[in-house]
Amino acid sequence: MLVVGRSPINRVVVAKIVERSGLKTISEAPDTAMAMLRIMAPGTIILDGGSDNKDCDGLMQSILSLRLASGSNLPSVILLSNRAGTPESLSLSSAVDIVVAKPITPERLQPVVEKLLGRC
């Protein structure tokens, strides 16, 4: 699983929550995540949208390209947002599957990760 965000602290917090589900995580800043997407094809990506949900906009086209190449909806994309809603109601890229509102806690994020993994 790839965790992307500008804040190193948020990346660590999110990675620790995800690791509770038994997943290995790689954490990257938005500017270095592009290179990581070329190296690996993660099944799930968690993006921290920042204050305006735009911190990771530069990755959206690459994510959509990965989906096109795989012929599926993988990688799944979770956006961590300051606003609650659906990707559609927040006018987000079609690359975003699920929005999780901040503050990020294990009680909010872990069930979403488990659902994507098909464990719920």
Annotate each predicted stretch with a short phrase.
Residues 28-44, 48:
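Acidic, metal-coordinating helix/loop segments flanking the phosphotransfer/catalytic sites
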Residues 46-73:
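Conserved phosphotransfer microenvironments
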Residues 57-58, 83-99, 111:
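Alpha4 helix (beta4-alpha4-beta5 surface) of REC/receiver domains from two-component response regulators
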